[in-house]
Structures are given as C-alpha cells and as structure tokens.
Regions:
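Short, low-complexity N-terminal intrinsically disordered segments enriched in polar/charged residues
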Residues: 3-4, 18, 22-54
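N-terminal export leaders
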Residues: 6-10
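Structured segments of extracytoplasmic/periplasmic soluble domains
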Residues: 39, 43-47, 51, 62-66, ...
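Low-complexity, intrinsically disordered terminal/linker segments enriched in charged
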Residues: 110-114, 118, 123-131, 137-138, ...
Length: 160
C-alpha cells in the first residue's frame, strides 16, 4: 500500500484549487448579464443577509477597472484623512442596512458587450430602483456604473 506524501497532497490541493479558479472564470465568462446580477443580489435576501464585501477580490471581480480605481481612491483618501469614505453604504442596495425579501431584476441588452440592469426591491418599506451599467470583458460581466435616486456611484465616490 502506497502512502500519500505531504508533497503529493499539497500538489493535489493546488491542482484542485487551480481547477476551481479556472472553472469559476470560465463560468463567469459564460454568464448572462441576468445571471451576473442574480449572483450579486442573492447575497442580500433576508434580514441577516451579509451582502458582498467591497474588498479587493470582490472589486476585481465585479467592477470595471475605472470604477474599481474610483472605489479604491475613495477608500485611500478617507483612510489618509482618518475619515469615513464618500461611499458610506452598500452601492448594491443604496443603504447601510437592509431587510429585503426579493428582487425584481430585468436586463436590457444595449450591444453584444453592454447591458443595463434594473433592480427593484423593497428595503423594509423603502422602495428602491437601482440601475447598473454592465460591460462584458474576456473574463465576464463587470459593473461600469451604478445609479440610484441619489445619483451615480462615480459622483458619490468623487464627493461632488
């Protein structure tokens, strides 16, 4: 009977992890804009839903490079001044807290690589409509802008 060495176990772990990353990237590239938005918003359903963190891995996966840079710049400026960032809430639900039971998500294709998603929901009695401009790149769909009743995400991030 052959013993599995630690090295073989580690190599097998890396192979599985690499395969998972590759299959996730392939799945993301195959997603429809509606699938992309459904995958985001399912994280916000229910009173104790955690939402999505806006950490580096999430921003890399979800946003276009220019919008990602604006989010990072806002966080850096705030940290430098020891202040709260201009983005002081969750841009996906336009709130700091939420209790959402369901979402009505519709998508309108603008071009083969551009779509606009409209998300309607009730956040504990506050009716909201969020519009997301989506752009497809080689690794899947990304958000290029989010618009709420308060304006665009880029405008909020700039502090204007």
């Amino acid at each position: 009977m052959r013993m599995i060495s630690r090295r073989n176990l580690i190599e097998a772990g890396f192979a599985v992890a690499a395969g998972s990353v590759i299959s996730l990237a392939a799945a993301a590239a195959e997603q429809t804009p509606k699938d992309f938005l459904d995958a985001i918003y399912k994280n916000y359903i229910g009173k104790n839903a955690k939402g999505l963190p806006l950490d580096k891995p999430a921003t890399m996966r979800l946003f276009t490079p220019p919008l990602r840079k604006a989010i990072d710049d806002d966080s850096r400026r705030a940290a430098k001044r020891n202040e709260v960032p201009n983005l002081d809430g969750d841009p996906f639900v336009d709130a700091q807290d939420w209790d959402i039971k369901s979402f009505d998500i519709s998508v309108q294709d603008k071009a083969p690589d551009k779509s606009t998603g409209t998300v309607k929901f009730d956040n504990d009695g506050d009716k909201k409509t969020i519009t997301l401009d989506l752009v497809k790149s080689s690794d899947g769909w990304h958000i290029d802008e989010i618009t709420t009743a308060d304006g665009t995400l880029r405008k909020i991030l700039s502090g204007k």
